[in-house]
């Protein structure tokens, strides 16, 4: 198969391939970028593989950076762009079900392509637009089928993360997973215990954000991969429930919303502990927890001024959008009116602070002062106290009299 025209991203990189060829080596576009051209999808990466060894690659170009030279990768800076150029390689026995014990550089494109995960990712493209297909990847693209390169058992035994990648590709490409490949994924799902949680999180997160996330999640559940990931053991029915009520074309607004949906489906009450077990950032944990909290509050009442002040408009919209997607009653107008009616959006907008009260009212730092400031903040947010110095002083004096 030959492409009549290369996309602009690849055309811009053609001088790189030509320079390598002029130096006497082979060079091809490889990986997901080639697959995405053939599927008429947006191109995110332009990866180049070559028969030149790293030192030979560096000799061809004037500006290079060693970013992974032990694995054969050199970053080339050319034409105001950066390109990762990797030497054809083979890999020895894998350790930890993730990393090869040794990488050997080779001159053969086929040897390089045979170490790839799936046939649709094992395609190469030369500078003329000719597609090199050593493992029937074009046929699988046409069939919309995900198939492991070579023996599926070996591919997942080598690198168990490929199992999660398979679910993710099914979701992002809307591809069926070929039967033998899927059986091997099921058989080796237990190896996911050996993979770093951070890497599994990245793949599951990409799955959730894919257009056909339900398909990917269905494969994930059928393979029982959930049993080997944090907080999901024996939660098949709840995970299946994650897909309930959404129409076929629903996609999540954000990763935070997607993970909030999972927590809600799992009926977890220790959201942060669950998210921490996935080694997510504190900021991510906070945002997901806000969405979950607001979603649960909405099960019994409309959101109050204090709810919107504490958790913010963005989390409230994501929560309400989740309700809408599930066919539950929503009230965006009330929510936005309530938010717009807030007199402050942050405690730093209050016209007095602890230092002022200590000086003006001769108060001492401590729990009493902190408690009073919380009362002031709450009263201002709820609209029962004006954010004015005199009003706040009078409010505090009255509170002190009542204590």
UniProtKB/Swiss-Prot annotation:
GO terms for biological process: RNA repair; tRNA 3'-terminal CCA addition. GO terms for molecular function: ATP binding; CCA tRNA nucleotidyltransferase activity; magnesium ion binding; tRNA binding. The keyword ATP-binding applies. Keywords: ATP-binding, Magnesium, Metal-binding, Nucleotide-binding, Nucleotidyltransferase, RNA repair, RNA-binding, Transferase, tRNA processing. HAMAP family: CCA_bact_type3. This is CCA-adding enzyme. CTP binds at residues 32, 35, 116, 159, 162, 165, 168. Homodimer. It catalyses: a tRNA precursor + 2 CTP + ATP = a tRNA with a 3' CCA end + 3 diphosphate; a tRNA with a 3' CCA end + 2 CTP + ATP = a tRNA with a 3' CCACCA end + 3 diphosphate. Its EC number is 2.7.7.72. Catalyzes the addition and repair of the essential 3'-terminal CCA sequence in tRNAs without using a nucleic acid template. Adds these three nucleotides in the order of C, C, and A to the tRNA nucleotide-73, using CTP and ATP as substrates and producing inorganic pyrophosphate. tRNA 3'-terminal CCA addition is required both for tRNA processing and repair. Also involved in tRNA surveillance by mediating tandem CCA addition to generate a CCACCA at the 3' terminus of unstable tRNAs. While stable tRNAs receive only 3'-terminal CCA, unstable tRNAs are marked with CCACCA and rapidly degraded. ATP binds at residues 32, 35, 116, 159, 162, 165, 168. PANTHER family: CCA TRNA NUCLEOTIDYLTRANSFERASE 1, MITOCHONDRIAL. Its cofactor is Mg(2+). Mg(2+) binds at residues 45, 47. CDD domains: NT_ClassII-CCAase. Disulfide bonds: none annotated. It comes from Streptococcus uberis (strain ATCC BAA-854 / 0140J). Belongs to the tRNA nucleotidyltransferase/poly(A) polymerase family. Bacterial CCA-adding enzyme type 3 subfamily. InterPro entries: Bact_CCA-adding_enz_type3_sf, CCA-adding_enz_C, CCA-adding_enz_firmicutes, NT_sf, PolA_pol_head_dom, PolyA_RNA-bd. NCBIfam families: PRK13299.1. Gene3D superfamilies: 1.10.110.30, 1.10.246.80, 1.20.58.560, Beta Polymerase, domain 2. A single active site specifically recognizes both ATP and CTP and is responsible for their addition.
């Amino acid at each position: 198969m030959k492409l009549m025209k290369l996309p602009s991203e690849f055309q811009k990189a053609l001088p790189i391939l030509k320079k390598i060829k002029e130096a006497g080596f082979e060079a091809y576009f490889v990986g997901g970028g080639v697959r995405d051209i053939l599927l008429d999808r947006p191109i995110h990466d332009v990866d180049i593989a070559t028969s030149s060894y790293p030192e030979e690659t560096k000799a061809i170009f004037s500006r290079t950076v060693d970013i992974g030279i032990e694995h054969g990768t050199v970053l080339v800076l050319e034409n105001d762009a950066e390109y990762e150029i990797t030497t054809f390689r083979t890999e020895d026995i894998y350790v930890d079900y993730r990393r090869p014990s040794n990488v050997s550089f080779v001159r053969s494109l086929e040897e390089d392509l045979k170490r790839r995960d799936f046939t649709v990712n094992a395609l190469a493209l030369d500078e003329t637009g000719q597609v090199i297909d050593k493992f029937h990847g074009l046929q699988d693209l046409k069939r919309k089928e995900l198939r492991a390169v070579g023996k599926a058992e070996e591919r997942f035994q080598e690198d168990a993360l490929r199992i999660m990648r398979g679910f993710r590709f099914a979701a992002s490409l809307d591809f069926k997973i070929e039967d033998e490949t899927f059986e091997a994924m099921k058989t080796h799902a237990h190896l996911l215990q050996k993979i770093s949680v951070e890497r599994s999180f990245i793949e599951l997160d990409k799955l959730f954000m894919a257009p056909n996330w339900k398909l990917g999640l269905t494969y994930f559940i059928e393979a029982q991969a959930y049993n080997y990931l944090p907080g999901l053991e024996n939660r098949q029915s709840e995970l299946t429930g994650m897909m309930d009520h959404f129409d076929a074309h629903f996609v999540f607004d954000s990763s935070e919303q997607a993970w909030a949906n999972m927590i809600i489906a799992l009926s977890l009450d220790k959201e942060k502990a669950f998210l921490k077990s996935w080694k997510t950032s504190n900021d991510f944990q906070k945002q997901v927890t806000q969405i979950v909290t607001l979603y649960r509050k909405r099960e019994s009442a409309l959101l109050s001024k204090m709810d919107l002040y504490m958790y913010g408009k963005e989390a409230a919209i994501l929560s309400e959008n989740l309700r809408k997607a599930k066919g539950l009653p929503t009230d965006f107008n009330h929510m936005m009116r309530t938010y717009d009616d807030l007199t402050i959006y942050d405690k730093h907008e209050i016209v007095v602070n602890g230092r002022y009260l200590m000086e003006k009212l001769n108060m001492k730092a401590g729990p009493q002062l902190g408690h009073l400031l919380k009362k002031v903040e709450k009263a201002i947010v709820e609209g029962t106290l004006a954010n004015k110095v005199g009003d706040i002083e009078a409010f505090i004096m009255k509170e002190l009299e009542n204590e």
